[in-house]
């Protein structure tokens, strides 16, 4: 019994890769979160962006669409730090807290970017809190 091309196409699994599914899920979580929070000049949004190797954080004023302060694990003083990615995330949290204080900001709205609150995200948030930022 010969298979037709339609039969062969019907048997192929349809779907996305696991990484694509995770990325889409994260973007959906972030969209839900963004509907609820917004940054103001007095209380900007602390946005976290994580990659496999680095972590970036920004203080964003959504009314103007401007970045008030930023910190990243790509910076030289963080790159030279010995330790794992979590230790670098802690240092980035300390840097953003220092830069927020220098800009006159004491309180922020935390935007975890759709990432689960744990690991590097939690380490960054805890370090920022310990250095004086109010969430």
Curated annotation (Swiss-Prot):
The gene is rplR. It comes from Mycolicibacterium paratuberculosis (strain ATCC BAA-968 / K-10). One of its GO terms (cellular component) is cytosolic large ribosomal subunit. InterPro entries: Ribosomal_uL18_bac-type, Ribosomal_uL18_bac/euk. This is Large ribosomal subunit protein uL18. Disulfide bonds: none annotated. GO terms for biological process: translation. It holds the Pfam family Ribosomal_L18p. Residues 1-23 are annotated as: Disordered. This is one of the proteins that bind and probably mediate the attachment of the 5S RNA into the large ribosomal subunit, where it forms part of the central protuberance. GO terms for molecular function: 5S rRNA binding; structural constituent of ribosome. It comes from the Bacteria.
């Amino acid at each position: 019994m010969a298979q037709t091309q339609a039969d062969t196409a019907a048997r192929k699994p349809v779907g996305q890769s696991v990484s694509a599914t995770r990325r889409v899920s994260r973007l959906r979580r972030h969209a839900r979160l963004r509907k609820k929070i917004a940054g103001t000049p007095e209380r900007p949004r602390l946005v976290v962006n994580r990659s496999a190797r680095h972590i970036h954080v920004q203080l964003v004023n959504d009314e103007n669409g401007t970045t008030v302060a930023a910190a990243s694990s790509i910076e030289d003083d963080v790159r030279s730090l010995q330790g794992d990615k979590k230790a670098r995330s802690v240092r980035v949290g300390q840097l953003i807290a220092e830069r927020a204080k220098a800009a006159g900001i004491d309180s922020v709205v935390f935007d975890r970017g759709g990432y689960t609150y744990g690991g590097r995200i939690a380490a960054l948030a805890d370090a920022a809190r310990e250095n004086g930022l109010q969430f």
